Amino acid sequence: MNLNKLFTALRQRKNVPAHNQQAGRRERYTHALEQFLDGHQPAVRLGGVYTLANLADEWLTDASLPEQVRREEAQTIIDSLTGCIRTPYPLAQKRQILESDEAPEEYEGDFARDQEALREEQLVRRTVFKEFSRRLAAVAENNKVDKAESQHAVPPISPTWADLRFDFSGAPIFYPLRQLHFQNADFASTTFYGPADFSGATFHGETSFSAAQFTADASFNSANFNDWVGFSAAHFAGTAEFSRSRFADAASFATVTFTGEADFSDAVFSAAADFAVSAFKSDADFSRLNTEGIASFAAVTFEGKAVFTASTFHDEAHFAASVFNRPAVFSKSLFGGAARFAGIVTKQSAMFRNVRFASAADFSGASFTQYEDFGGARFDGDATFSRASFIALPRTRYEMDFPQHANFGNATFAQDADFSQATFTAHVGFYKATFARAVSFNGASFEGAYFADATFGHGADFRQTSFMYVKPSFVRLWIGGCRGHGSRHRRIRRITCLRRARRARTVSGAARRNFLIERSFSLSARCCTTRIPGTKSSRSTPASVSLRSKT
């Protein structure tokens, strides 16, 4: 007998049990799928779910097959189960009604029967997620370094489960999914009827909720996203709760609409957090937010109160062109990277009290209304407020309790500060503010200004600056940075524009009358030779102040 034919016959005989086993799995798969789809009793349908999940385990652990074949067979089963999850269910839209204790008036249909049918469908569909979760949790547990010392007993599941895809896109979800594990989950364009509960859930692999519709409250409290997650273009009709959630990779909430209150308090973003062009229709709570990567809130609209109290931005923070229609609160926050607030609009109070800007802070072109508080703020990098406007709108009887002024009292500017072309139609206070380096108010316009006890450690540029209606106060002003005069800081006592203008030789009577309405002056600590109007000597004068009427 030919040896080649003998070896071929032996191989075929050896593979007969394997082929029979694979054929048996396919027969069980067909039967289980029929049970799941066509069974009229919940117990029968649940039996089909368990059988299908176990068959996926068998395929993945069959060492006689190539890994690709094992994965393809298991993926076929997963696709069948997720396909059933995506199947429309008419009673899903009535979830909140059917979960009530009593039938509402004029309810169409048999309320009791519909209640029972909804509960059964919720049980079966949620069981599919629970079977997935049980295996994915086991994979995560087995991947731990000290899995031998784990307190949780888990079955030996193939890590190939972590490579499978779970497509729930467009599905109707009408049951809670809290404290479950998900892997490579696609919830794009999914509609969540009633409360969407993912609290305590863990997401592995890339996760998508893009364009998802949350018709009621949504809870992701204490959820963990271990890889990229996207909520772009999603809509939250109720409250959106992400308190204490953790994002290990980049997270996108771009163009999301939050109709109800949004709670991201104590959330941690270890990579980029993108909320650009989102809309918050109600209050947004980001207090104690922690972002390790770039945080983008550019062009965001806040219709309600925006709270970022005690938040930490380790990298760049972008709020450029955002609109705050209600109070914006950033008090006690830390900006480790560049803070970009260029072009923002605040319609009510803006609170930046005791904020630390460790890098550059850009508020150029910003528009502030009502009340701005930068008291105790610290600017370690360049601070730019060029072309910013501080506007006091006419008060109404509903706004009488809102003070209308800008406060930079006790603020510290460690690097250059630029307020050029800024407009303050509300009173602004720089009481005890410290400018360690050059500061420019060139071309700025003040309704009223208070610089008492302010310290200018370097050049201070007030050229073309105008003070309208209310004379500025420079009581106990300190100006430094003038070389060749001994001490670094020299004190100028009681510089009052109106008094000096009346004694200055260059100011005519007509100009003085005009000066009472609108005055401008130039203050520079870089020149030490020009006499201050009203003084007798220029030798000990550390800076020059020239007062002139604005024509």
What function would you assign to each model-found segment?
Residues 1-551:
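Intrinsic low-complexity/IDR segments
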